[in-house]
């Protein structure tokens, strides 16, 4: 069986592990995009420390869970979004105003929608976490 969307698989694995009460989770295969999404989640306090482990194949991320994630998921298709449209997408994917983050891939890297609004840049929606 082939893995069609590694990011969606990683986020659902994190959500399921949180619900069961696990303290750490191993995500494979690892990629730069998954690493950047984990960095944004760590910055906002949704996960603890994470590290890349080279297993000779694609690699593995070991992630410490803090029990703060209610739901995390990938956004498919990757909708393009302008700075003025973030509020519309926030209403669609997040349960309440200013609760949770949308993760956006921009020309300046992967960041939350709050950072993108501050910098005044748009991008493509890739994930949500709350």
From Swiss-Prot:
An example Gene Ontology molecular-function term: structural constituent of ribosome
GO biological process: translation
A GO cellular-component term linked to this record: ribonucleoprotein complex
Keywords: Ribonucleoprotein, Ribosomal protein, RNA-binding, rRNA-binding
InterPro entries from the UniProt entry: Ribosomal_uS8 (IPR000630), Ribosomal_uS8_CS (IPR047863), Ribosomal_uS8_sf (IPR035987)
Record carries keyword DNA repair: no
The keyword Membrane appears for this protein: no
SUPFAM superfamilies, sorted: Ribosomal protein S8
Pfam families: Ribosomal_S8
Family membership noted in the UniProt record: Belongs to the universal ribosomal protein uS8 family.
Summary of the function given for this chain in its UniProt record: One of the primary rRNA binding proteins, it binds directly to 16S rRNA central domain where it helps coordinate assembly of the platform of the 30S subunit.
Subunit and interaction comment: Part of the 30S ribosomal subunit.
NCBIfam families per UniProt: PRK04034.1
Protein name per the record: Small ribosomal subunit protein uS8
Species this protein is from: Pyrococcus furiosus (strain ATCC 43587 / DSM 3638 / JCM 8422 / Vc1)
Gene: rps8
């Amino acid at each position: 069986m082939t893995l069609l969307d590694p990011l969606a698989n990683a986020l659902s694995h994190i959500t399921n592990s949180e619900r069961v009460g696990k303290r750490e989770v191993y995500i494979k295969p690892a990629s730069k995009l998954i690493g950047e999404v984990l960095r944004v989640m760590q910055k906002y306090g949704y996960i603890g420390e994470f590290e890349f482990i080279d297993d000779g194949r694609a690699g593995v991320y070991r992630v410490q869970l803090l029990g703060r994630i209610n739901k995390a998921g990938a956004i498919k298709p990757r909708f393009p979004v302008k700075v003025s449209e973030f509020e519309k997408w926030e209403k669609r994917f997040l349960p309440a105003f200013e609760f949770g983050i949308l993760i956006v891939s921009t020309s300046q890297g992967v960041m939350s929608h709050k950072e993108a609004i501050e910098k005044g840049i748009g991008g493509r929606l890739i994930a949500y976490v709350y």
